[in-house]
Structure formats: structure tokens, C-alpha cells
């Protein structure tokens, strides 16, 4: 348990909202965020090619959403949010942080709605299998 806490603290330092996004993912899917950390062509660092399934498309849309955020770094931003009646509610006054939260909220909901498409064959998916031309956001 102590090692997990140390890893979580280190990950938060690397990517400010990773922990928050992970909590959203777990709330909507009951799966660890690690299940989505290296999945398909878009879940995880970077992304290229064609999304492999609806789950991977959630990550593609999430990447596109981050690309529209202006005024803060989505990967380093810590935002306000809460869980109310099974829903994720983004809060706070900063429009940029709220936009980052919305990107994460929509992706977490998307993962929950597409759990039936999650296929373990796309876990640890090689980017060499993602050589098709990338779609436009």
C-alpha cells in the first residue's frame, strides 16, 4: 500500500490532474485508470493513427479536447470537481481549469459508456500498429 501511495504522489507531480482524472475514470467504470494508460493508439502518451475501438476513440476525443484548451497546461492543471448523484460536476471560477475538467469528465463518461468495447488485445498496444493516417479533430 505504501508503494502505491508513493507512485500516486510521483504521478501527481508529473501530471497534475492525472490523479483527478483517474478518480473520475474509476467512478464511471470501476476500473483502474491504469487500464487506460497504454491502450490502443490514443490512450496514454501521444497518439497517432486510427482509434482501434470506441474506447480508444474516447482517448482520441480527449486528446482533441486538450488541444482546444487555452491559458493553462491540461496535463499540469489541478481543477475543482465533485461527484453528485453519480455525475461528475466541474467547478471553480478559472475557465481554463474548468475546460480541462470538462475534457476529463467527458472522457471518463465515454469510458463508462463504452466498457463493452474494451478489449485486452489493445492493452500495451504497439504504436507500430498505429501507422494509418491520423484523423483530424
Curated annotation (Swiss-Prot):
GO biological process, one term: phospholipid metabolic process
Signal sequence bounds: 1-16
Cellular component annotations (GO), alphabetically ordered: extracellular region
Catalytic activity: a 1,2-diacyl-sn-glycero-3-phosphocholine + H2O = a 1-acyl-sn-glycero-3-phosphocholine + a fatty acid + H(+)
Necessary cofactors: Ca(2+)
Cofactor descriptive note: Binds 1 Ca(2+) ion.
Entry binding sites for Ca(2+): 42, 44, 46, 63
Function: Snake venom phospholipase A2 (PLA2) that is not toxic by itself, but the synergistical mixture of a basic and this acidic protein is lethal. PLA2 catalyzes the calcium-dependent hydrolysis of the 2-acyl groups in 3-sn-phosphoglycerides.
Complexes and interactors: Does not form a complex.
Stated name of the protein: Acidic phospholipase A2 VP8
Species for this entry: Daboia palaestinae (Palestine viper)
